[in-house]
Amino acid sequence: MNRILVIVPAYNAGLTISELIQKVSKFIDKTNILVIDDGSQDQTFTLAQKAGAVVLKHETNKGKGEALKTGFKYAQKKNYEALFTIDADLQHDPSSIRDFLQKANQNFSGIIIGTRGINLKKMPLARWLTNNLTSAILSILSGQRIRDSQSGYRLISTCVLKRIKLKAKKYDLESEILVKTGRSGFKIDSVPIPTIYQESKSFINPFVDTGRFIRIMLRSIWW
């Protein structure tokens, strides 16, 4: 693959966005790094531009799903063959890009998910349990084995995006992609990535998160 885009959905990521861009640029040229500033109230937009990335801005916060869809449209318009999605908070190690690309050389035509290992010293137990439950549900819905459904670190073929129609607007879009990719006959693969968690407080409530995925399961009947 010669044309690969890196999509970074970002909201108030001023503390990390410059460092992330510099680290990603060791593997992907900065002209192929796209930051979607999703209505940030800090200096995310300015800092991302200064770091050399291409930056698109939502005037208001629309949610991660809408930020990703903006990036997907850009990738298709610019005729990229594939795209990475990577979080702006440095919880995804850019050096893993090499492992994704090596895996992609083995007849890639779907989605590769960066899968975190089981390490309860680094991953909170409640989040680990939630991730396992939702991964099991999405494996059933997609018809393929999904080891880490909550990982947003992914390599996606634009062929997938041309085939499926996405409806979700927030975080559940990442689950919708997996279900529709599997149902459309594309392969969902995985590659090991480091488990990294920042010391800052997580905004994820595992109980609310589980309820959200139950709703996803019900909505998927009409996907």
Please report, for each region that a protein language model flagged, where it lies by residue:
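Short hydrophobic beta-strand elements that form part
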Residues: 5-9, 57
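Cell-envelope/extracellular polymer assembly enzymes that use nucleotide-activated donors
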Residues: 3-5, 176
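Short beta-strand-to-loop acidic/aromatic patch adjacent to the donor-nucleotide binding site
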Residues: 80-89
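Acceptor/aglycone-binding surface of glycosyltransferases and processive sugar-polymer synthases
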Residues: 54, 59-77, 94-171, 197-222
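Short, well-formed alpha-helical segments that are part of the catalytic scaffolds
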Residues: 12-26
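A conserved acidic beta->alpha catalytic loop
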Residues: 37-45, 90
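Acidic helix N-cap motif at the loop->helix transition within catalytic regions
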Residues: 15-19, 42-51
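Catalytic donor-sugar/metal-binding loop of nucleotide-sugar-dependent glycosyltransferases
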Residues: 145, 166-169, 179-195
